[in-house]
């Protein structure tokens, strides 16, 4: 879909908040989820499947679509990439048996700030 088509889709979604338009936006930006998941998959040392990362990222995409302020002068792709990445990392943290606080203490100890 071209830029004009995306703009029209966004305007339709904003005016109606229709699930149908939201689903079209999800399909339109699904490739962005795959891109972010692929980048994270290269750097994560966990035994997490790529398809799982994509699944976690879809939740981030849905959240980004629901919360995006189209009136601001920000590209959706930029905003959504951060939300998608955050959703993936949040799910991975939930699966980890070491609490986030312990990681914070470990990093502080390693840097000598503890």
Predicted feature residues:
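Alpha-helical promoter-recognition and RNA polymerase-docking modules of transcription initiation factors
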Residues: 1-98
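Conserved small/polar residues in nucleotide/adenosyl-binding loops
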Residues: 104-113
């Amino acid at each position: 879909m071209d830029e004009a088509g995306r703009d029209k889709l966004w305007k339709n979604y904003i005016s109606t908040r229709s699930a149908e338009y939201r689903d079209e936006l999800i399909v339109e930006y699904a490739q962005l989820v795959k891109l972010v998941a692929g980048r994270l998959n290269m750097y994560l040392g966990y035994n997490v499947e790529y398809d799982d990362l994509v699944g976690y990222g879809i939740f981030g995409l849905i959240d980004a679509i629901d919360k995006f302020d189209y009136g601001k002068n920000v590209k959706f792709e930029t905003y959504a990439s951060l939300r998608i990445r955050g959703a993936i990392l949040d799910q991975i943290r939930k699966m980890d048996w070491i609490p986030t606080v312990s990681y914070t203490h470990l990093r502080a100890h390693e840097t000598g700030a503890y």
